Amino acid sequence: EIRLSLVGSEMCIRDSDHTAEHVRAYIKVQDGCNQFCTYCIIPYARGRVRSRKIAHVMDEVHALAAKGYKEVVLTGIHLSSYGVDFPAEEKETLLSLIRAVHEVEGIERIRLGSLEPGIITEEFVQSIAALPKMCPHFHLSLQSGCDTTLERMNRRYRSAEYAEKCGLLRKYLGNPALTTDVIVGFPMETEED
């Protein structure tokens, strides 16, 4: 649900509804996007990046743990940009959020929603590999394996970089589950692409 009067404010991101019989809760920690991929309307429909403060997210995580939830999935329209909207003096990152959730008693598993390849750095992967509650499952947006198409899509990575990021995850996490999404038939894409 989007209320246009709230677009651009943290209030646009609502706490999720949860039911007692479930063990997995989805927590939306971020909304909006600043990427402006050529095929995507999200920056226009949802606005720019807005992140929930860690303290606010933690209130929800603690409440979920108290209700018996064992697993949380941190989600967002552009999860990798979590925190980029905060002023420098109030900087919070996705990694700092993950670490905070990891400390919550009762939460046994943490998953992440879809990530952009750019967030997968050696430091990021080493850090999450050191957190036993992190599930080794990552959805990395690919969209196309063709660099020309990626450029036309206004994606900010190329296929070799994407493969390198997958390699980093495998290096530090052994055999993680990797999933992706691919757009087929993008305008001007050829059979060779």
Locate each region found by the language model.
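Single conserved hydrophobic/aromatic residue that forms the stacking wall/gate
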Residues: E1-G8, C12-I13
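His/Asp/Glu-rich metal-coordinating catalytic cores
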Residues: E10, R14-H22
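Hydrophobic packing within well-folded, soluble alpha/beta domains
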Residues: M11, C33, C37-C40, V57, ...
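Conserved beta-strand segments that form the floor/walls of ligand-binding pockets within enzyme
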Residues: C12, Y26-K28, I41, V73, ...
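Short flexible coil/turn linkers enriched for glycine and charged/polar residues
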Residues: T19-V23, C33-Q35, M134, S144, ...
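Canonical Radical SAM [4Fe-4S] cluster-binding loop centered on the CxxxCxxC motif
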Residues: A20-A55
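Conserved alpha-helical substructure of the radical SAM core
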Residues: R46-V73
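Conserved SAM/AdoMet-binding glycine-rich loop
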Residues: A66-E191
